[in-house]
């Protein structure tokens, strides 16, 4: 069975807001956003740029990461985009199985 790799990405709008999403094809999805066929949240937001993308593996992990990143503050998202290691730390924290407590 063929395993599809999912990616997490952040798009920057003209007013410097960051939109977070997941996809199996970053180039295709970004083009959809640029042509108004993507998320409604990005329609009419002016020029868009791809600020960040990274492979995360399975869809379930991509969904968890998307949720966690959407909970971050703008400052925390900017640090993630800048490559401060927070993406890797988040990725690792979601990869580690929860500790079983007695």
UniProtKB/Swiss-Prot annotation:
Record-annotated membrane-spanning stretches: none
Gene3D superfamilies the UniProt entry points to: GIY-YIG endonuclease
Record domain GIY-YIG: where: 4-79
PANTHER family per UniProt: UPF0213 PROTEIN YHBQ (PTHR34477:SF1)
Family, per entry: Belongs to the UPF0213 family.
Protein name: UPF0213 protein Ent638_3592
């Amino acid at each position: 069975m063929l395993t599809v790799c999912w990616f997490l990405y952040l798009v920057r709008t003209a007013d410097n807001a960051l939109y977070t999403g997941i996809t199996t094809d970053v180039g295709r999805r970004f083009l959809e956003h640029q042509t108004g066929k993507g998320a409604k949240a990005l329609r009419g937001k002016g020029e868009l740029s791809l600020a960040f993308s990274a492979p995360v593996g399975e869809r379930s992990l991509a969904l968890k990461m998307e949720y966690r990143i959407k909970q971050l503050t703008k400052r925390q998202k900017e640090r993630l985009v800048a490559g401060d290691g927070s993406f890797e730390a988040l990725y690792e924290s979601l990869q580690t199985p929860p500790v079983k407590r007695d």
